[in-house]
Amino acid sequence: MATASLRYYTYDANNQAPERLLGIENVENIDEMLIPLNEKNTPIFITKAFTGIACKRWRVEFVLGIEKNIWGVWLSEKDISKDVYLSQTMKKRSIAHAGGIVKRGCIVIVEFGHIYLTLNFSNGLSDSSHYPCYHQSGEMHKRRPAIVVSADKRGVKVVPITSQEPDGHLFNRAIFELESASTTYISEFKRDKPCFALCEMIQTVSPTRILPPEAKDMKSSDRKFRRDESYYRKLTTNDLHALEEGLLAAVGLAALRKKNETLLGERDRLKNTLDEQEQVLASTSHALEQTRTLHDDQKKRYEVLSQLYLASSGHTSLQSIEAEVSEYL
């Protein structure tokens, strides 16, 4: 029966004390397994509960083959004492769903998870493309800032943010660069690097993955960076507008919106024309009513005068008076 093992050790670059064995995972009759390494060699964090160890969140420092079928993973403790996830805040406040706390435009931090490599005990390392139940290359990964789009009982829709300038972002309306006013005094953003919102990568995440950004508390006297559970950090007005445009572009509705705006403009123009015509009609109707009143008045006057003239003119009927009037006209 073939056996392989993964051994976990402590690592501290500032401490020359011998490394400590934290735990061992043994596998039997298994040819390969996923290990916390990635092709880009970016930092990876794992959650592991070792017997007798209080820390459960670790940073992977490096992974090495020790001998045949034995690999070592060296870890350093990650301080999560200040981390408070949205799910915890919801529980404390007895709020049923995330929408009661985070709103559209809120800046949050999301644990998207990591992309692992596959360790084959005979052939070595390879990508994890044949493990579709895990994160794959090209998918959003690692802890990063994001923007809340909406939230309900099913989860929170977010747009991830990256500091890596996306290819062709100047021509891609689904990507926009954030204003510095949106990101200032948030430790997860670097001052000297621009930040881009990737609206085309919108996705739904669980509240258990979300925590508030570590932002400077301008209301306190010490103005320290802390994770404020009120989630008060939001996009600027301009960035909110850019978010709306980016989301429309991401689902192919930017052109439809432009057409809709054109149609709305034409509707408003026609409405204004109709209002003007209604005013003209109202004015004409008023003038017509005045003319009709004047006509009725003149008609009554003519009838009275005709009767008076009939008595003294020698005419025997109104018809003969009409004939006389017609001769004068």
Describe the residue ranges of each PLM region:
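Short coil-to-beta transition motif at edge beta-strands of beta-rich domains
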Residues: 3-4, 33-35, 99-132
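A mature extracytoplasmic/lumenal domain signature
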Residues: 114, 160-162, 203
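Active-site substrate-binding loop(s) of clan PA
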Residues: 90-92, 122-123, 135-137
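C-terminal terminal-subdomain/extension
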Residues: 1-104, 173-329
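Compact nucleic-acid interaction/catalytic patches
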Residues: 132-143, 148-185
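Residues in well-ordered beta-strands of folded domains
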Residues: 109, 159, 198-200
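A short secondary-structure junction signal
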Residues: 119-122, 158-160, 169-171, 209-212
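Short, acidic Gly/Pro/Ser/Thr-rich loop/turn segments
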Residues: 117, 165, 204-207
